[in-house]
């Protein structure tokens, strides 16, 4: 148990650091001052016009996916940024397979017209 003591202490401290800020506002919060204006949607000082839950076109989601693709690519490319003589063949081929999958996905989205604006 003594070899796990630092891990347990770290776990307790990290839980306290993350849970205390969540619990501190509750004793100071009051439910008596709820105004309907505070609960309404804000539209530049005007009364809300229309429903706030309108439908979005699926193209917005496709564009967001296009922006998400480079994030894992960069993240998984960092370990590959070592001198070429330090990478074994498995690491080299696995990175090539990863880049091939990303390239195929990007070509698929391009062919489907995800970046086209109509």
Curated annotation (Swiss-Prot):
Core subunit of the mitochondrial membrane respiratory chain NADH dehydrogenase (Complex I) that is believed to belong to the minimal assembly required for catalysis. Complex I functions in the transfer of electrons from NADH to the respiratory chain. The immediate electron acceptor for the enzyme is believed to be ubiquinone. The chain crosses the membrane at residues 4-24, 87-107. Keywords: Electron transport, Membrane, Mitochondrion, NAD, Respiratory chain, Translocase, Transmembrane, Transmembrane helix, Transport, Ubiquinone. Its main location: mitochondrion. It is a multi-pass membrane protein. It holds the Pfam family Oxidored_q4. Belongs to the complex I subunit 3 family. One of its GO terms (molecular function) is NADH dehydrogenase (ubiquinone) activity. One of its GO terms (cellular component) is mitochondrial membrane. This is NADH-ubiquinone oxidoreductase chain 3. Its EC number is 7.1.1.2. It comes from Panax ginseng. It is found in: Mitochondrion membrane. It comes from the Eukaryota. The keyword 4Fe-4S does not apply. InterPro entries: NADH_UbQ/plastoQ_OxRdtase_su3 (IPR000440), NDAH_ubi_oxred_su3_sf (IPR038430). It catalyses: a ubiquinone + NADH + 5 H(+)(in) = a ubiquinol + NAD(+) + 4 H(+)(out). The gene is ND3.
């Amino acid at each position: 148990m003594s070899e796990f003591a630092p891990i347990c202490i770290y776990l307790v401290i990290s839980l306290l650091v993350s849970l205390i800020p969540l619990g501190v506002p509750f004793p100071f919060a009051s439910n008596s001052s709820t105004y309907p204006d505070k609960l309404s949607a804000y539209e530049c000082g005007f009364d809300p016009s229309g429903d706030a839950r309108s439908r979005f076109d699926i193209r917005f989601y496709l564009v967001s996916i296009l922006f998400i693709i480079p994030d894992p690519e960069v993240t998984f490319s960092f370990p590959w940024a070592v001198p070429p003589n330090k990478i074994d063949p498995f690491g080299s081929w696995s990175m090539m397979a990863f880049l091939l999958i990303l390239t195929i996905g990007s070509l698929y989205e391009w062919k489907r017209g995800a970046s086209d604006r109509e």
